[in-house]
Amino acid sequence: AISDHVMYQLKEMNPLFSKVIFISNSQLSEKYVSVLFSKDLIQEFIQRENIGYDFAAWKAGLELEGLDNLEKYDSVTVMNDTCFGPLWDIVGYYEKYENDPEIDFWGMTNHAEVKGHNLYIPEHLQSYFISFKKRLATSNVFRKFWESVVAHTDVQKVIDEYETQYTKIFMKAGFAYTAVLDTVPIHQDYFHRNFTIHYPQVLLDYKVPFIKIKTFDLSQHLSPYTLKTIEEKSSYPIDLIDSHMTSVSIPTPAYLLDRKVIEPSNKIVSVDKKVAVHLHTFYVDLLP
């Protein structure tokens, strides 16, 4: 199946692109693929084995189109389905960055450099959303990078060899990038470097149009605020978040419980079947 938030994302972003290649690393039935085509949400579909994660999938998409054919496009965007969004109209972001002659590739957030005793992570544009402009997409360094991508089975290898490295490779070749939220100037004021997981409120303050799905479970203490802010300050259908997190987070996390309260009804219902209720109460003093 295709999650509703993915369908929404495709619908909202489709007008931006002259061609959309949808790549699935999990098996999709013909029924769902047909829906994508019938609604004109995609132009090409790739069903592939679940190896290599997003970078190998993007490579497959680029190979299908042909790296030599990228010349006919103004830009090439790669993204995955690890986010909810767009929270706000995405057109303005494209107009801003695509029309900036100083920028060759851009995305939502970056990760500041980390220098530790046994750890080094270079500054990099986080890869859940990247848009490459023509000058970079038609370059030799772009071709060489994607030709080097291997379908690793270990996600950490994908992170170490591709996600954290591609920014440095392209910058070394003379290309410049930017992010909607540039964390480099502000990261010293925060304990964690990965803002997408730990500081969703900062992403919302900077109007980053995508919010990572896993931030809701990994930063549950912030999730009520995150949901409330999205509901009040964006037009994003909040039920897409509620329903998806309910289906992937079992048991239902505490931050969703107040959204599942059933309104009292005076309607009398007659049921001829026995109903068992299992109520687990940790604090018995909370019982009436």
Region locations from a protein language model:
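ER/Golgi luminal nucleotide-sugar-dependent glycosyltransferases, focusing on the catalytic module
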Residues: 1-288
